[in-house]
């Protein structure tokens, strides 16, 4: 059985020859947006694999003798043979891309060609060799077989006809309807031209690789169809019958494989675009193994081609075209492969199924081979294609990105491939609304403060906040409301009242969130004073005087007047009052009884307040004294003397008598000052002594106390000093306490002495004389290493020394410390004002309040205060550079209003001098400027033109050399300019020449003396006059040029002049 490709080519050749021999094939009526419902058992339909325009599809049907209808549907061409008219009745559908074009043919066909064509058509499958199987047609046209209702059939509207005209471009003439030579299919209006039936199938070659000029018509564009189509000749492969043997040989098969690597063999049915042929000439040739027939356009009236069934050779006439007896190559049929439309899925959906669709369907008892390949995929995709040799490919666990798949379908004589893209998009993000945050949520101000800040920059969102909007909910009307659409709300000129503000933030997705902030502005209230006369007092005679204190009275502004007076019930009592209009009232000469005193205070607003205090004077009540001889003593022999101290004894009225006496002991002692509070005992020996103290008051009441003195004889061990070892202190912490309490002694340590080492820094203060106590307290230490020696001494005079070391390390935040000098006394800067100032600085520097750390506040002068602080960034915490913070703060302060901060800023600078001075000097910590080393100086350009930073970049030696060089160059250049000017002036001074007109001159002399370039002297009156010059610089006597001298000097000139101009003449000054 012959291959289908060869049979189809033979069929196309026959119908081409038949079409050339018979009358013209004409285009009939065209229906747009219409389909047919044929009986697939009796109606033959063939699908053309390539995509053609409508006009080319019609031409292909005209070239096939048994084709009655060209059906162009969705970009594909179908050739239909209609044995029954009702099978090809157009039915209108919706707006689809479908066009039905009927072809008109003569009723009578040549018998010999018809018999041969029927023989070829009836060979093979029952539905015709050129028709596809009904199953393939149903797969390709899924709507066939449906029962279309009558309501779907309607007349065509004007827009359908306009579309039809745009696609087909019909001419203006119309073929008369009802001709006997055509069937009764409707004629297309204006279808005047006919179609040439001299085209068959030819292997298609890609446009970029075609070289054969006879096959160049395959590349012609079909975008502009014309009613008349050009003629061309084609090469058609003829089929071989079973009797002719094998068509393809092994060497031809190898050639086909080599050619298929450059261009895939395709079997296509191409329509002809030719004018109505006048004749068709066909040369008779001998067809051997695989002949190729060349059909040349010619006259169909004189030549009828013979079917290529004869194998007998024949001689060719001069008019016949030679046919190359080459063997027809084996052709590979191109398959139309589609993997479906490009897919787009969105996570979490990560599975997809791909299926390959192939047209035409595989022949009976054969199948196609499928191969799926992944051409491109995201970098993070690690999967592999499994079961990639099936028609359906299942994919799972796809990640985000673009996947490009290629499916290759092949069989023994067919090949095709298709591509499909799978795009996996990330899961849709769920937008979270923003969170509006205001800081602080509640503020309270008291006049005269009338400005406030509310910060909304701490609001957060999962993407981005694009807008802030502030609005006042309630409160007094604000005349000046600024920055309502910025993160920070600045309010000024506030009136007393309660304010509420709403902040609304909007993110990039349009979600909003709101929160409120409250602000309370209080009036400057003048509260009345509060009088405080102090607590009640009780005194006992004979004490009859006391002082009352009213300085605890208070007022929010100032108390201007104090008034003391006797209270109710005490008006007639005797008392001496002093300082009745001062805070302190001195009372004296009081008698037994109760006194009531009233204090009235008046403030600056004349508001008053009163308070009452009671003084009770009790009668005299004597109590016995209390004798205190002191703690018991323990002494070490030998003892020169011992002191007995009874000064701690007490009495309510006073002790008037002291007496010491020796009660018992191992030996007699000598006592001095036995009638005084402090007595001295000598002559003590080893043992225990008891002494008694007796005291008496004025009323004779007495009291006694006993003191024990133990005298021991022991060996004394020296004490052990413990100063505390080594300590490390990190600035700004500059205070420390050295503890020597761990020093020990067998008896008792009686003295401690801390001595600073001579090599230690002198800076640093000792608090409260603690260098003589057990603990040494130090403050105001500076960077360096301090050494202190602790000397301890016991009661026997033995001593010991130990050393303590304090290493003060520099502040790690030194490079970030900024000094802010404010015009305010250090005593007036309260804690509340400091917190407000920190919030204002945070707004200026665009940081949080907690990011600003105040390290030190100290007085700069009586009217100024220095605040030392640093700024740390958000986690991870890092201290910002002081130079950047100072520069940023200075820039922001210059842009804001003068009263933005609570106090006027006098200076902003770094706390330490951080300049490196280019390695040729050091930085002055007071002036914050570089002090250059010897032979170095500042870079004046950088200092005064660029960034203004102090430095020591210039060497004085090089600057001096450069300055000297510049002076020399400047002087040389000046001297050169002076010389050039003098030379130019010298060249300009020339001899002035006077000219006199000479009239008697010939034409040659005039030409010789004529000025160059036609320049005329301003003293001449004629163009051709001759001038005689006189010099003013030679002498005072004029030099006269005469014609006689010229003639004597040059005889030739004289001769020639006399011949041309006549006799010579003399010209001198008298002739002028």
Curated annotation (Swiss-Prot):
Keywords, comma-separated and alphabetical: Cell membrane, Developmental protein, Endosome, Glycoprotein, Membrane, Neurogenesis, Repeat, Signal, Transmembrane, Transmembrane helix
Superkingdom classification of source: Eukaryota
Ranges in the topological domain labelled Extracellular: 21-955
Transmembrane helix keyword on record: yes
Motif Endocytosis signal: where in chain: 995-998
Tissue expression profile of the protein: Detected in adult brain cortex and fetal frontal lobe (at protein level). Highly expressed in brain cortex, putamen, amygdala, hippocampus and cerebellum.
Biased composition (Low complexity): 311-320
Effect of residue 995 to A: Loss of interaction with AP2M1 and impaired endocytosis
Positions of transmembrane segments: 956-976
Coiled coil segments of this chain: none
Segments in the Cytoplasmic topological domain: 977-1072
Subcellular location: Cell membrane; Early endosome membrane
Positions annotated as glycosylated: 196, 219, 262, 394, 421, 498, 513, 536, 551, 733
Function, as annotated: Involved in neuronal migration during development of the cerebral neocortex. May function in a cell autonomous and a non-cell autonomous manner and play a role in appropriate adhesion between migrating neurons and radial glial fibers. May also regulate growth and differentiation of dendrites.
Subunit annotation: Homodimer. Interacts with AP2M1; required for clathrin-mediated endocytosis.
Related illness: Dyslexia 2: A relatively common, complex cognitive disorder characterized by an impairment of reading performance despite adequate motivational, educational and intellectual opportunities. It is a multifactorial trait, with evidence for familial clustering and heritability.
Stated name of the protein: Dyslexia-associated protein KIAA0319
């Amino acid at each position: 059985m012959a291959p289908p490709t060869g049979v189809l080519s033979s069929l196309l050749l026959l119908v081409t020859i038949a079409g050339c021999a018979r009358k013209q094939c004409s285009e009939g009526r065209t229906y747009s947006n219409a389909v047919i419902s044929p009986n697939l058992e009796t109606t033959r339909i063939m699908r053309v694999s390539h995509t053609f325009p409508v006009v080319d599809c019609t031409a292909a049907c005209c070239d096939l003798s048994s084709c009655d209808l060209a059906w162009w549907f969705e970009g594909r061409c179908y050739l239909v043979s209609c044995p029954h008219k009702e099978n090809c009745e157009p039915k209108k559908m919706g707006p689809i891309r479908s066009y039905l074009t009927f072809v008109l043919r003569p009723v009578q066909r040549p018998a010999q060609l018809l018999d041969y064509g029927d023989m070829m058509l009836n060979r093979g499958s029952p539905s015709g060799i050129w028709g596809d199987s009904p199953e393939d047609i149903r797969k390709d046209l899924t709507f066939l077989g449906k029962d279309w209702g009558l309501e779907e059939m309607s007349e065509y509207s004007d827009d359908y006809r306009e579309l039809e005209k745009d696609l087909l471009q019909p001419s203006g003439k119309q073929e008369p309807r009802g001709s006997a030579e055509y069937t009764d299919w409707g004629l297309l209006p204006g279808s005047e031209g006919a179609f040439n039936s001299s085209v068959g199938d030819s292997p298609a070659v890609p446009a970029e690789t075609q070289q054969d000029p006879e096959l160049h018509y395959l590349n012609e564009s079909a975008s502009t169809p014309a009613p008349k189509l050009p003629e061309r000749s084609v090469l058609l492969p003829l089929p071989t019958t079973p009797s002719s043997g094998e068509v393809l040989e092994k060497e031809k098969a190898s050639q086909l494989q080599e050619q298929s690597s450059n261009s895939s063999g395709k079997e296509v049915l191409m329509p002809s675009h030719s004018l109505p042929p006048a004749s068709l000439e066909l040369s008779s040739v001998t067809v051997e193994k695989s002949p190729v027939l060349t059909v040349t356009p010619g006259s169909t009236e004189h030549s009828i081609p013979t079917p290529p069934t004869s194998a007998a050779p024949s001689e060719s006439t001069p008019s016949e075209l030679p046919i190359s007896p080459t063997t027809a190559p084996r052709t590979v049929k191109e398959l139309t492969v589609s993997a479906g439309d490009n897919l787009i899925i969105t996570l979490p959906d990560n599975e997809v199924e791909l299926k390959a669709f192939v047209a035409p369907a595989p022949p009976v008892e054969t199948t196609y081979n499928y191969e799926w390949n992944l051409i491109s995929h995201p970098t993070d995709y690690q999967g592999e294609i499994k079961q990639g040799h099936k028609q359906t490919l299942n994919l799972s666990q796809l990640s985000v990105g673009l996947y490009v798949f290629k499916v290759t379908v092949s069989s023994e004589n067919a090949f095709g491939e298709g591509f499909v893209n799978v795009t996996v998009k990330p899961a849709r993000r769920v937008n979270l609304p923003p969170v509006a945050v205001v800081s602080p949520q509640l503020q309270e101000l008291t006049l005269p403060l009338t400005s406030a800040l509310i910060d909304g920059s701490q609001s957060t969102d999962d993407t981005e906040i694009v807008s802030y909007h502030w609005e006042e909910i309630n409160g007094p009307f604000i005349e000046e409301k600024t920055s309502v659409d910025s993160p920070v709300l600045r309010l000024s000129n506030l009136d007393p009242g309660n304010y509420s503000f709403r902040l609304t933030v909007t993110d990039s997705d349009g979600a909003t969130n709101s929160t409120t902030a409250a602000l309370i502005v209080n009036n400057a209230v003048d509260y009345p004073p509060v009088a405080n006369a102090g607590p009640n007092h009780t005194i006992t005679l004979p004490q009859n005087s006391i002082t009352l204190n009213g300085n605890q009275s208070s007022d929010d502004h100032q108390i201007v007047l104090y008034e003391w007076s006797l209270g109710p019930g005490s008006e007639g009592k005797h008392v001496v009052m002093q300082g009745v209009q001062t805070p302190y009232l001195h009372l004296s000469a009081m008698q037994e009884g109760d006194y009531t005193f009233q204090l009235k205070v008046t403030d600056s607003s004349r508001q008053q307040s009163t308070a009452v205090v009671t003084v009770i004077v009790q009668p005299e009540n004597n109590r016995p004294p209390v004798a205190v001889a002191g703690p018991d003593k323990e002494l070490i022999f030998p003892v020169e003397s011992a002191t007995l101290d009874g000064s701690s004894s007490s009495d309510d009225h006073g002790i008037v008598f002291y007496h010491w006496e020796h009660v018992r002991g191992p030996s007699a002692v000598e006592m001095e000052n036995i009638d005084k509070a402090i007595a001295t005992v000598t002559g003590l020996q080893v043992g225990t002594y008891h002494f008694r103290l007796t005291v008496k008051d004025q009323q004779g009441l007495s009291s006694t106390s006993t003191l024990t003195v133990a005298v021991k004889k022991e060996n004394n061990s020296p004490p052990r000093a413990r100063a505390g070892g080594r300590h490390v202190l990190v600035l700004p912490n500059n205070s420390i306490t050295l503890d020597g309490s761990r020093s020990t002694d067998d008896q008792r340590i009686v003295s401690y002495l801390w001595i600073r080492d001579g090599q230690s820094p002198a800076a640093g203060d000792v608090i409260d004389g603690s260098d003589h106590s057990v603990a040494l307290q130090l403050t105001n230490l500076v960077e360096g290493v301090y050494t202190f020696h602790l000397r301890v001494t016991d009661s026997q005079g033995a001593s010991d020394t130990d050393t303590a070391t304090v290493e003060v390390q520099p502040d790690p935040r030194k490079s970030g410390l900024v000094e802010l000098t404010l015009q305010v006394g250090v005593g007036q800067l309260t804690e509340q004002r400091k917190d407000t100032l920190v919030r204002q600085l945070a707004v200026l520097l665009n940081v949080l309040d907690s990011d600003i750390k105040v390290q030190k506040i100290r007085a700069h002068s009586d009217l100024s205060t220095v605040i030392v602080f640093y700024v740390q960034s958000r986690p991870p915490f890092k201290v910002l550079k002081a130079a950047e913070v100072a520069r940023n703060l200075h820039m922001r302060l210059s842009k804001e209003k003068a009263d933005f901060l609570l106090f006027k800023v006098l200076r902003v600078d770094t706390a330490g001098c951080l300049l490196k001075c280019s390695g040729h000097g050091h930085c002055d910590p007071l002036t914050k400027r570089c002090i250059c080393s010897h032979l170095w100086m500042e870079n004046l350009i950088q200092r005064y033109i660029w960034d203004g930073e102090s430095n020591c970049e210039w060497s004085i030696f090089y600057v001096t050399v450069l300055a000297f060089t510049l002076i020399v160059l400047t002087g040389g250049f000046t001297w050169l300019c002076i010389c050039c000017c003098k030379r130019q002036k010298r060249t300009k001074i020339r001899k002035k020449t006077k000219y006199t007109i000479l009239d008697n001159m010939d034409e040659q002399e005039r030409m010789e003396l004529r000025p160059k370039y036609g320049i005329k002297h301003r003293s001449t009156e004629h163009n051709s006059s001759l001038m005689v010059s006189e010099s003013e610089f030679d002498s005072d006597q004029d030099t006269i040029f005469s014609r006689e001298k010229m003639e004597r000097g040059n005889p030739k000139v004289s001769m020639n002049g006399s011949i041309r101009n006549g006799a010579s003449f003399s010209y001198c000054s008298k002739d002028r």
